[in-house]
């Protein structure tokens, strides 16, 4: 079987036209030469990022020794930025300090970019969150199964590009077992008693299909197809 695409195809023309969409003032609807910097309170450290970005290797006290994806920094570089750009950032709670439940912590995102009109812009977004205890019911009610599955898929793809697929599948299974033992209700040594609340019940199904999906199992898929599917996943919004 052969897959091919030509410059005359309607789909290619639509995609090329989309790249040059302009706003009401005639400027391109994208940003260039982008940097994203993260600063946060001392109890939180940044582990890394997954998405269309590269690490600038700017280490300081905010950066965790544990690296995930593009890590070892609190500043990342992007070639372009659009309303579909989506990056997953990973954080680690510091073990050095004991935080009080209900106290606040802050994460600030500082984005600098060159606008379509060639002006230099800077936007600052600050998010405030509350600490909760390890057994707080707010962890259960606040869990987003779809976002968690999307992030785990990105992590799995990041790993499978460096390790063997069966090793990544074993890692997914191990993480799912850890997830179930932490959030499931069960009587030890009695599998029939295992239950997950409705806020967690879909997540194991997502992992079941992920380990069998074209993102991980690339048998009978061309490198172009594999790259396409994985690129589409990187555009998924983590709502």
Predicted segment positions?
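Extended acidic, low-complexity intrinsically disordered regions
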Residues: 1-239
């Amino acid at each position: 079987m052969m897959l091919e695409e030509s410059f005359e195809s309607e789909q290619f023309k639509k995609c090329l036209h989309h790249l040059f969409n302009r706003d009401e003032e005639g400027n391109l609807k994208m940003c260039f030469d982008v940097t994203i910097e993260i600063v946060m309170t001392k109890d939180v450290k940044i582990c890394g990022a997954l998405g269309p970005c590269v690490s600038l290797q700017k280490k300081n006290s905010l950066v965790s020794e544990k690296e995930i994806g593009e890590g070892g920094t609190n500043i990342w570089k992007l070639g372009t930025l659009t309303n579909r750009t989506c990056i997953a950032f990973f954080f680690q709670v510091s073990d050095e300090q004991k935080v009080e439940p209900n106290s606040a912590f802050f994460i600030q995102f500082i984005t600098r970019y060159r606008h379509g009109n060639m002006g230099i812009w800077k936007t600052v977004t600050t998010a405030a969150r509350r600490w909760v205890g390890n057994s707080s019911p707010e962890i259960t009610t606040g869990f987003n199964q779809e976002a968690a599955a999307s992030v785990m898929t990105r992590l799995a793809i990041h790993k499978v590009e460096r390790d063997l697929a069966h090793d990544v599948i074993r890692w997914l299974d191990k993480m799912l077992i850890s997830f179930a033992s932490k959030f499931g209700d069960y009587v030890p040594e009695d599998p029939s008693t295992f239950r997950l609340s409705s806020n967690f019940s879909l997540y194991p199904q997502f992992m079941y299909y992920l380990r069998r999906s074209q993102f991980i199992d690339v048998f009978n898929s061309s490198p172009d197809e594999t790259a396409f599917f994985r690129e589409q996943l990187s555009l998924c919004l983590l709502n």
